[in-house]
Amino acid sequence: MKRNILTAFAATSLIFSSTQAFALINFSAGIPFSHSFSGNWYDGSAVESDGVSGMFIQVGVPIFPGVGMDSYKTKLKDSTAELATTIYNLYYLLPIPVINLTLGVGAGSTELQCAACSSAFEKGSATQWYASFGMPIIPLFDLHLSYRSVSSKIKEKSGTNEHDLSGNVMGLGIGFNF
């Protein structure tokens, strides 16, 4: 009987000491490492990424939704243009012991940036949903992998052609809990 009680106490201590329920505030920062496009240019040709750089940040408190911002630029393959995306997020860190699962939605803008882009393309809107899976490395820090599904369309100023620049962004980050 004593052994069962001690085992249950030890297991409970390990599980609950690594949850984020004890934290007063959480802060997370990450970087995108992959951006793949599912949309096409208006003529049907594929949009391809040649690398992505930027950041993701988010701040929250337990039980309540948190806020965040994504800001990144994606270099387009065989082009001098970059796709600049800025999205503001609302997320919720699910209270699951041992792992940190975050679900969120966001809205913002996207635009093509190059020498002639501002005169040729309008600024487009962007929306996303995302999920982040984190594993605590020590009780107040975690490493997380995120997946973002972004919907984005940009119109040409000279006509009705609309480019679908939707896609998926993968990121890697670290979370701190105070």
Residue ranges and their predicted role:
Residues 147-178:
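Hydrophobic secondary-structure block in the mid-to-C-terminal portion of proteins
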Residues 5, 37, 41:
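Solvent-exposed, flexible loop/coil residues
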Residues 27, 46-48, 101, 143, ...:
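Short, isolated positions in well-ordered beta-strands
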Residues 1-26:
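Cleavable N-terminal export/targeting peptides
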Residues 40-50, 77-81, 116-122, 156-163:
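Outer-membrane beta-barrel domain signature
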Residues 23-38:
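Short N-terminal segments immediately surrounding and downstream of signal-peptide cleavage
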Residues 31, 35, 54-143, 167-178:
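Gram-negative (and chloroplast) outer-membrane scaffold detector with strong preference
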